[in-house]
Design a protein with these regions (language model features):
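P-loop NTP-binding core
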Residues: 1-265
């Protein structure tokens, strides 16, 4: 039975895609069968692995009932790593989920919409060791779905005071969903501090996050690394865990090891 890891932050630009991709690649390198599910309407993750992702069936078609989820799983160039792509039409799916969620809340009906992602994944749970969800920022309905589906939610946050407000909102919402549920939800959640530097401001921000959220913060932090524009490739831009000669590569390797302990892989 697959473990589900979800990367969420209600604020955009927090590093969800880079986090998702590097965790996925690291676990695949460790020999686990990994499925990366793109739930972001921008399809950034999809575009890195599938050239014509906009014209490729994926999560949108599964949710619309046009495709079976087993038929939209695509292999990648990396051993043990597969992907289900997204596209811009995912926005329509998100809006429909939000409408269902709102309707069920105001009518005080049993909220079935929160099980949407969990239900979609059920037919393939025995095909993979780990399923990783790379999420759209904005929609609370998807975050709620992830709380119901995931074993672990990773909340990436940049070194930025405004970003810290975003992670505070995300964590509070996750706690509200867990405490407000009639079920005993077994969903862990932890903050991942990214794009750290050696500056005093960066160190102070890391200390602030650790002092505020205590044990809800990963020990590992991810170093900021910007490759020169002429050297930037897919690997330097997203898959940094492969280069263990760099600080950021070692950071992602450490994160994967920490996550394995967290979800008992």
């Amino acid at each position: 039975m697959a473990k589900i890891i979800s990367c969420n932050n209600q604020k955009g630009g927090s590093g969800k895609t880079a986090t998702s991709v590097n965790i996925a690649k690291g676990l695949a390198d460790d020999g686990y069968k990994v499925l990366l599910v793109d739930l972001d309407l921008q399809g950034n993750t999809s575009s890195k692995f599938i050239e014509d992702f906009e014209n490729t069936s994926g999560i949108v078609e599964v949710l619309n009932g046009k495709s079976d989820i087993k038929d939209v799983i695509y292999s990648t160039d990396f051993d043990n790593l597969s992907i289900i792509p997204s596209k811009l039409e995912w926005l329509d799916c998100l809006e429909e989920l939000a409408r269902q969620d709102y309707y069920e809340e105001i009518k005080k009906k049993k909220n079935k919409s929160v099980y949407t992602i969990k239900t979609l994944l059920e037919p393939i749970m025995n095909q993979f060791d780990v399923i990783i969800l790379d999420n759209n920022p904005s929609y609370k309905t998807i975050l709620k779905n992830c709380v119901y589906a995931a074993d672990l939610i990773v909340v990436p946050v940049n070194i930025d005071r405004n970003a810290i407000k975003g992670v505070d909102y995300t964590i509070r919402y996750i706690i509200d969903v867990i405490t407000g549920s009639e079920e005993d939800l077994d969903c862990k959640f932890k903050i991942l501090v990214t794009k750290t530097t050696r500056t005093r401001v960066s160190r102070n921000c890391v200390d602030l996050i650790r002092n505020t959220f205590k044990d809800l913060v990963f020990e590992t932090t991810i170093t900021n690394q910007i490759a020169p524009a002429e050297k930037q490739t897919f690997f330097e831009d997203y898959i940094m865990i492969d280069n263990l000669n760099t600080k950021v590569g070692k950071d992602y390797r450490s994160l994967v090891d920490e996550i394995r302990k967290e979800i008992e892989l």
